[in-house]
């Protein structure tokens, strides 16, 4: 089941490598007020007020290297001796990267966070703030990305990297196709949308085995563990899965051994993750809308389009969707028929409701800049994107490996 990332606007195909080191890929969250949480820097709260504000919640900036967001939160919960569900965040961040983000929590004293703020390897806590506001998913403007691309010797301009300076300057990088990027589906193991489709179809057994079994791009004990799941040898699988990184699979398998109920297994997952499966399937369908619109029409405003900030939008199909009119509506109807969808089925009893919304088909890139390091054959780029948009969608237009 592909990711439906089929079309390009630029397709520069630079032959290079990203993320040779985590610090080659920097993601800095931008708050709703437009403040960039710069790596290694305090926002600038006044020291004398920092712990004197009234409120039930605490917000802080978490800087991490080579941690995924959920594992980092789980480690913070362990160190502070509180429950993981007491923490919240505005958005997940890449693992193999240097990232910053605001995190919220309750039931923890600021002094406890001060104690552990530099005690976890590759995680730093700063800017601790009491507040009355609960930090929720989506409570951010977006992210700033700063990325190094290291040219391979096989690149056509490896011996004259300065040519890319002019090429990048002359390319229009104001707008990009508003695809959901590979992270939405699983960068290393792209099965999230497949699990979501099974859940939409109420096939929780297939969803369970696709998530916990079905090895893809894996080797060693993890591959063996997933094969054990596929064979129904759950106790053997539990002994093989590394406990730190495969926490969710372990919880689901244990719950299945206990209950024999595939659907119930998904209830032991964090709510954000259990929702992510169906959200990923909705994203897969939206990406197909972009493909059809790009291939057969254009992104000019057409009769019947619902327009947001000057851009045409499409439906993220869900239980409350009102279909578009005109050509965009025809595209949506085609996808519904092709996938044999009943939109009301996105309301899944005793699991969750996925009402759908609208999303721009193209999106704006802000403050795109590039520079060349001729001595080391490195191209550095930086840009800002609003929440819900994916840097990989920009990068796939620039670099061949995406």
Swiss-Prot record:
GO biological process: tRNA pseudouridine synthesis
EC number: 5.4.99.27
Residue positions of the active site: 94 (nucleophile)
Swiss-Prot/TrEMBL keywords: Isomerase, tRNA processing
Cysteine disulfide links: none
SUPFAM superfamilies named among the record's database cross-references: Pseudouridine synthase (SSF55120)
Function as written in the Swiss-Prot or TrEMBL entry: Could be responsible for synthesis of pseudouridine from uracil-13 in transfer RNAs.
Family: Belongs to the pseudouridine synthase TruD family.
Stated name of the protein: Probable tRNA pseudouridine synthase D
Lineage, broadest ranks: Archaea, Methanobacteriati, Methanobacteriota, Methanomada group, Methanococci
């Amino acid at each position: 089941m592909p990711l439906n990332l089929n079309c390009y606007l630029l397709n520069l195909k630079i032959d290079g490598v990203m993320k040779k080191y985590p610090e080659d890929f920097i993601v800095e969250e931008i708050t709703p007020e437009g403040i960039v949480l710069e790596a290694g820097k305090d926002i600038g709260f006044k020291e004398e007020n920092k712990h004197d504000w009234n409120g039930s919640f605490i917000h802080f900036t978490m800087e991490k290297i080579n941690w995924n967001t959920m594992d980092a939160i789980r480690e913070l919960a362990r160190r502070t001796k509180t429950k993981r569900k007491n923490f919240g965040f505005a958005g997940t961040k890449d693992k193999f990267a240097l990232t910053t983000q605001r995190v919220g929590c309750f039931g923890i004293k600021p002094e406890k966070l001060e104690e552990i703020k530099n005690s976890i390897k590759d995680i730093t806590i700063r800017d601790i703030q009491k507040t009355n506001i609960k930090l929720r998913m989506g409570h951010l403007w977006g992210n700033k990305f700063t990325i190094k691309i290291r040219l391979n010797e096989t690149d056509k301009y490896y011996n004259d990297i300065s040519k890319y300076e002019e090429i990048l300057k002359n390319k229009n990088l104001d707008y990009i196709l508003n695809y959901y990027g590979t992270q939405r589906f699983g960068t290393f193991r792209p099965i999230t949308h497949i699990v979501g489709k099974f859940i939409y179809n109420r096939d929780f057994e297939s969803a369970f085995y696709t998530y916990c079994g079905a090895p893809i791009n894996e080797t060693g004990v993890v591959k063996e563990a997933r094969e054990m799941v596929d064979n129904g040898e759950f106790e053997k699988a539990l002994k093989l899965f590394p406990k730190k990184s495969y926490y969710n699979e372990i919880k689901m398998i244990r719950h299945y051994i206990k209950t024999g109920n595939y659907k119930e297994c998904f209830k032991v997952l964090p709510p954000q993750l259990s929702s992510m499966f169906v959200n990923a399937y909705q994203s897969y369908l939206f990406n197909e809308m972009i493909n059809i619109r790009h291939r057969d029409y254009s992104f000019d405003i057409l009769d019947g389009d619902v327009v947001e900030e000057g851009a045409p939008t499409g439906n993220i199909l869900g239980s409350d969707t009102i279909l578009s009119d005109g050509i965009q509506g025809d595209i949506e109807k085609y996808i519904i028929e092709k996938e044999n969808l009943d939109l009301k089925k996105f309301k899944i009893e005793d699991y969750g409701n996925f009402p759908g919304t609208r999303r721009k088909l193209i999106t704006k890139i802000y403050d795109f800049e590039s520079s060349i390091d001729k001595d080391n054959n490195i191209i550095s780029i930086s840009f800002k994107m609003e929440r819900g948009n994916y840097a990989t969608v920009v990068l796939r237009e620039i670099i061949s490996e995406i």
